[in-house]
Amino acid sequence: MKVYVDADACPVKDIIIKESGKQNIAVTLVTSLSHYSLHEHPSHVETIYVDTGADAADYRIMQLANKGDIIVTQDYGLASLALAKGCYVLHHKGFAYTNHNIDQLLQSRYLSAKERKSGKRTKGPKALTEEDRINFNQLFLQYITK
């Protein structure tokens, strides 16, 4: 099992790195070159930089991931592809994407995009709370200790 992180806007990288290190699980952070950093991570963490294109990180994660790996993303499209590949997919707010909830999430995304295209404003995501971080930590631990 490996953990792949859609890392450009992931607010729980610290939790992922800490908890996976305790379990000796490899983590790959996939991020765009626009987020290049000299920050050093522990030896179980690899950072892969991709072009700044809209879905470049998603494509790279799908290229690397195998059935049974964990992917952390807030991107519903990537989540859908990863589920079809047999990966476990987690959102940083502490819920797992499943074959039971992904269609509703994709439909919601589509309707919001349709409203924005017609000139309406839609609400953005709520800010990450401490409760969200706790929920993610608990969920992540469940998956890496299976």
UniProtKB/Swiss-Prot annotation:
<protein>
    <recommendedName>
        <fullName>UPF0178 protein OB0454</fullName>
    </recommendedName>
</protein>
<comment type="similarity">
    <text>Belongs to the UPF0178 family.</text>
</comment>
<dbReference type="InterPro" id="IPR003791">
    <property type="entry name" value="UPF0178"/>
</dbReference>
<dbReference type="Pfam" id="PF02639">
    <property type="entry name" value="DUF188"/>
</dbReference>
